[in-house]
UniProtKB/Swiss-Prot annotation:
Complex formation: Homodimer.
Enzyme superclass (EC): transferase
Coiled-coil residue windows: none
Cell compartment(s), UniProt: Cytoplasm
Major site of localization recorded for this protein: cytoplasm
Gene from which the chain derives: apt
Listed name of the protein: Adenine phosphoribosyltransferase
Pathway where it operates: Purine metabolism; AMP biosynthesis via salvage pathway; AMP from adenine: step 1/1
Amino acid sequence: MNLKDYIATIENYPKEGITFRDISPLMADGNAYSYAVREIVQYATDKKIDMIVGPEARGFIVGCPVAFELGIGFAPVRKPGKLPREVIFADYEKEYGVDTLTMHADAIKPGQRVLIVDDLLATGGTVKATIEMIEKLGGVVAGCAFLVELDELNGREKIGDYDYKVLMHY
């Protein structure tokens, strides 16, 4: 299945000069959505994953069905003020400054093997901050999986030597 058939391209969104890759059509098609989830599940199977971690919001949309299919838990990564219990923080660089992500302080147990799942790898800031928090809690990042990678933004450089899978490259 060619998943790119289910990605909408919107020019100059959210601002002039940006090409936005919208995964909504993929999610709206049951066969394409299931196929994408199964591809990530297959990638995860050999890695003996204990937990899926997904950044808000689209990491939830992709990561939760992967966790469900694997029969394991899911831990959300959110912006500050969105998680109700004790959290840890990690800052990351964005195009116009610094932002912060949080994760529950008890989300990952030491030694747990974690797969980070998100919709898009762009600059890599989000995944780098997520890796930092998982490792701070003693987790082992076994890999990362993305529906889409925007190759020209070089997000792969922020992942370093961690294994990763991408279903579509732009």
